[in-house]
C-alpha cells in the first residue's frame, strides 16, 4: 500500500456479492415492496473503485452458477440456474469498505456513487437478460431487506481484479 494509505487498483479485489440462500426475500423503500423473490438468492452487491463491466459479468456468472442448493442427496450441487430460483440484487456500498484498521470503516476503496450506480444498473440489466425471475433494490435508497435465510447458507463472492 502506498504511503497515502489509499490502495492502488491492483491491491483492491473486484466486485463483491454477499449471497444468501433464501426461501423468500423482499426489499422495501418507504414501506413499499419494490422487489421480492421466493426460493433463490439474495445478493448484496458492493462495487469497488476501478471495477469495470467485466467484473459485473464475472460476478453474474458466479451468482447464477455457484452451487449452493441441495441435490437429492442433500449436497450443495445445484446452482440458481439449475433450480430456476429467484435472484434479488440489492446494492450495498458498505461491502466495499476498508475495515482493516480502527473502529470506523473507510470508503476509499468503494467506487464513486455514479460509477457504482452505473455498474449496479449494468449488472441488473445483464441479470434480467440472462435469468428470470430477477428483482432489485434501488441504488442510493434507504431500503429495508427482509429474508428467510435457508440453512443458513451465506457466501462472500469476489471477482478477481483484472490483470494490469
What kind of region is each of these model predictions?
Residues 1-14:
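N-terminal amphipathic/basic-hydrophobic helices that include classical n-h-c signal peptides
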Residues 11-136, 150, 154-155, 159-164:
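Short Lys/Arg-rich amphipathic alpha-helical segments
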Residues 142-146:
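Beta-rich nucleic-acid/ligand-interaction surfaces
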Amino acid at each position: 500500500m502506498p504511503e497515502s494509505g489509499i490502495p492502488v487498483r491492483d491491491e483492491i479485489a473486484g466486485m463483491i456479492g454477499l449471497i444468501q440462500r433464501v426461501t423468500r426475500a423482499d426489499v422495501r423503500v418507504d414501506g413499499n415492496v419494490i422487489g421480492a423473490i421466493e426460493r433463490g438468492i439474495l445478493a448484496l452487491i458492493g462495487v469497488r473503485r476501478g471495477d469495470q463491466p467485466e467484473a459485473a459479468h464475472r460476478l453474474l456468472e458466479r451468482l447464477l452458477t455457484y452451487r449452493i442448493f441441495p441435490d437429492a442427496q442433500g449436497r450443495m450441487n445445484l446452482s440458481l440456474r439449475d433450480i430456476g430460483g429467484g435472484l434479488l440484487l440489492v446494492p450495498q456500498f458498505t461491502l466495499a469498505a476498508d475495515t482493516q484498521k480502527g473502529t470506523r470503516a473507510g470508503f476509499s476503496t468503494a467506487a464513486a456513487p455514479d460509477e457504482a450506480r452505473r455498474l449496479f444498473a449494468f449488472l441488473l440489466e445483464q441479470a434480467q437478460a440472462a435469468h428470470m425471475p430477477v428483482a432489485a433494490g434501488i441504488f442510493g435508497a434507504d431500503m429495508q431487506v427482509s429474508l428467510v435465510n435457508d440453512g443458513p447458507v451465506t457466501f462472500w463472492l469476489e471477482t478477481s481484479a483484472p490483470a494490469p
